[in-house]
Amino acid sequence: GGSVNVKYLVSTDCSDDSFDWTEGWNGKAQFLVAYQSLKDELGYDCDCLMECDNNGKSFGATPVACPTLANLTLIGNGESKQGIRLRAGTKAKIYNAIVKGKGQCLTTETTETENALMDGSSELQYITLATNISCKEGIYSSNEFTKDGNHNIINYSVMFTNGYVGTIEGGKNLSDDSFFTQAAYQGAVPASNDWTQGWTLKSGIAEETIEELKGEITTSKTLTEGKTYYLTGEYKVKNGATLKIEPGVTIIAKHDDIVDYILVEQGSKIDA
């Protein structure tokens, strides 16, 4: 619920839904990436890329969820689940999106949700799907989705680089709203501006190696800023050695039957 707004969000390898809203959310979002690695790599079939509800117990409960989202790249890993799943009375305004990797890239459910798509209180425009759509109630349809003016495409093969980098020309310009950045293309991450670089990694790309501190040191050693170390049993700083601990170091004593401690002998130093 609520009206929280968000930009530049990456969700990777969630076993449940990558993005999920419910209970009246009416905020705004732009530049969202959901990426699910191949099932053979993960060992499981991820759930929906985006599960979108108003209220599961009372579909028409107010305030009705109706967020505005733009520039989405949603890449799934299983034929058995949905991409964008609109249901439980939700409304939505979704623009400039690419969805692939699911057997049903878009599904609509419940009378309230499909009626909103027909009467214009919900909008789906400039959306490219790698597969078709499914409309449970039969009120909305793939013909409505692809009709002139919506600029939507179904059953279209989409290729990306580095997992999710790439866009499709043509999109809705929402910059009249001060929240939205002008980005009249479909997708979240253009090749000319990969904003995910430098602060995100897909699961399994870089796993931190945690060094154990045990035994003894006879020469100087530095524990490096930003790293984590496991203290395992006795760790002796011998005569003539210096143990330097930089700011931002994390030292974890393992929870087991062994007593963990650092012993600084006479004639040695600790610099922290």
Please give the residue ranges for each predicted region.
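Extracellular beta-rich repeat passengers
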Residues: 1-272
